[in-house]
A protein has these predicted regions:
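C-terminal motif of bacterial Sec signal peptides marking the signal peptidase cleavage site
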Residues: 21-22
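Extracytoplasmic "Venus flytrap"
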Residues: 44-63, 67, 71, 77-90, ...
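Hydrophobic alpha-helical segments within soluble ligand-binding/sensing domains
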Residues: 45, 88, 145-174, 220-222
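Periplasmic-binding protein-like
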Residues: 47, 100-107, 126-130, 179, ...
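Short, solvent-exposed amphipathic alpha-helices that sit
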Residues: 56-70, 152-156, 187-206, 220, ...
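Short beta-strand elements at the ligand-binding edges of bilobed clamshell
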Residues: 78-80, 136-162, 179, 211
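Flexible loop/hinge segments that line or gate small-molecule binding clefts
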Residues: 115-151, 170-176
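Conserved small/polar residues in nucleotide/adenosyl-binding loops
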Residues: 245-255
Length: 256
């Protein structure tokens, strides 16, 4: 299956996938069957998606399947890891044993990938990390295609700055903030939390009452928000990494 020197088109497809994910269909993405046999001229790509925890992730998975399709010259092996790192590692090892041309994965957490990525490197299979990032030797993967999560956190704080100014909020009055984080130790969670905190600390009147993991899911986001509303009487701002979770958090507030 090995086809050298063709990783740039794959990265280009993945960049388009991330750009279009927000516009994708919200369908349930399952792991693809491995019964078909690829033709000699197809590029075989094994993808390990971390799960389907949000509308964005589901759209992202749909975009991957649309971009890496047979009509575009690809043979796609797709695995939904269902929020478990061990499932991702198992899928990657399966792709290595099948001698795919490329491995693409969106890591659920940053750490714990060194061994399996070393195995892929020794098998001479290029690995492309998508969306979230990994914390390991960069030589173990070919490229990372994703966003600057720290800057996303800063942008959220900057938006809050402008919103408070527009509402003529008294700069001496305390702004009570609660944070619904994503998955613990995920690069998206770490980066956005860091970026928001950088700007928040320049505002002495911004008080972060609490911050807890909501796993990028509606159910967990609602659970954490219910806890906040029972614990704190005065909440001015909810910071959430996923707009859908944020909307459900407001729904919870109406119910209490």
């Amino acid at each position: 299956m090995k086809k050298k020197g063709r990783w740039i088109p794959v990265i280009g497809c993945l960049m388009l996938v991330l750009f279009l994910a927000g516009c994708g269909k919200t369908i349930d993405i399952q792991s693809t069957a491995e019964q078909e046999i690829p033709s000699q001229n197809q590029i075989v790509v094994g993808v390990s998606q971390l799960g389907s925890e949000s509308m964005w992730r589901t759209a992202n998975s749909a975009s991957i399947q649309q971009a890496l399709c047979k009509e575009n010259g690809y043979f796609l092996l797709f695995n939904n890891a269902r929020q478990k790192q061990e499932n991702q590692i198992k899928a990657i090892r399966s792709y290595i044993s099948q001698r795919v041309d490329y491995i693409v994965f969106s890591p659920i957490v940053e750490d714990g990938w060194e061994t399996v990525l070393q195995e892929a490197k020794e098998a001479d299979i290029p690995v492309i990390v998508m969306d979230r990032n990994v914390s390991c030797d960069p030589s173990l993967y070919t490229a990372w295609v994703g966003s600057d999560f720290t800057e996303e956190g800063r942008n959220a704080a900057r938006w809050l700055e402008e919103d408070l100014k527009g509402k003529k909020f008294d700069q001496k009055e305390t702004v009570h903030i609660v944070v619904l984080r994503g998955t613990s130790n995920a690069s998206a969670t770490l980066g956005r939390t860091k970026g928001f905190a950088e700007i928040a600390k320049t505002h002495p009147n911004w008080e972060i009452l609490d911050s807890d993991d909501a796993d990028f899911t509606t159910a967990k986001g609602r659970e954490v928000m219910e806890k906040y509303l029972q614990k704190y009487k005065d909440i001015d701002v909810v910071v959430s990494p996923v707009s859908y979770t944020h909307l459900r958090a407001h729904e919870t507030r109406r119910h209490l």
